[in-house]
Amino acid sequence: MKKFLLAAAAAVSIAASAVSVHAQDWTPPGPIKLMIAFAAGGGADTQARLIAVHLEEKLGWEFIPEQVTGKGGVNLLMEMKDQPNDGTVIGMVVMESLGYNLYSADVGLTPEDFTAITTTAGAQMGIIASAATGWGSFEKMIEAGKAGQDIRFGVMSQRLGELAYLLGKAQGVDFNIISVKGGRAVLNGVTAGDMDVGFMAGIQGPGVAAGDLTILASAMSKPLNQDPDAPLLKDLGVDFDGDAIFMFAGPDDMPQETRDAIASAISDAASDETTEVGALIKRAFGGSLILQGDDLDATVLRNFNDSPILIKAASE
């Protein structure tokens, strides 16, 4: 999707203030089923569960976490769509779930069939190589590819695969794109030497710090925190980005008071770095990124509507 995070980041303060009614008197009518689209034990799953623990302790709400993985969050959306919209069922996904993944699944649904509640953070998505490759820069990788080396490029979603294809096309290199399940599988593949390079969404941090991994580029619409000088995809000939933003959503037509109360509670926890979850978000994702209300709705819908443009570009 074209550069949507820059616009989103600029709107954060406006969007946060859009939730003007904190609905402090609202309480869930029962336990909240928290559906999580990510594998147990990962950073995103931990983030969701820590938010639940914090809200249980602070507000007395009760959460029942449940893993609903598969198809980049679409399995969760399909299971959630007919659930009660009274705040007792919410799900943690990424914006791509309601955007590219929902569009490409072709299940007859759009983001308008759900309630976007709030975002929490954006992943530090980068193009990362093993230090053993000897590539100290993106240019060195391209030189190797043009010299005939088979560049094995790991991706963990169809959308990222299309970005890798467009990147290779723009640079005149035919990457050997390897699709795996999850960012940890990309990390493991690069570390083991089964891949040369791949998209990683923050999991690369310790390896980069230790000198085992090398950042070649930012796959976001903004610089990476760990290497602000790394080139962006737009600098490398790609008009799309790999922004990955964590968010909560619910079934369609959630009452405004309910949506506002849940959004306020979650965003307060995510943005407070003195909380365990806030500290995790700061450490793993560089800090919170809060979008709510009309700004969030517009950003999600734009992500969805830009999907066929990316698909068409990758098919040419």
Each predicted region: which residue ranges?
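Alpha-to-beta junction loops
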Residues: 61, 83-93, 149-151, 173, ...
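Short beta-strand->loop
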Residues: 110-120, 174-178, 196, 209-241
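Extracytoplasmic "Venus flytrap"
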Residues: 33-48, 69-71, 153-158
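Sec/Tat signal peptide C-region and signal peptidase I cleavage site
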Residues: 17-23
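A ligand-binding cleft/hinge motif common to bilobed small-molecule-binding domains
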Residues: 95-106, 161-171, 192, 196-228, ...
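Hinge/capping helix and adjacent helix->loop/strand transition within the periplasmic-binding protein
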Residues: 26-31, 55, 79-88, 101-185, ...
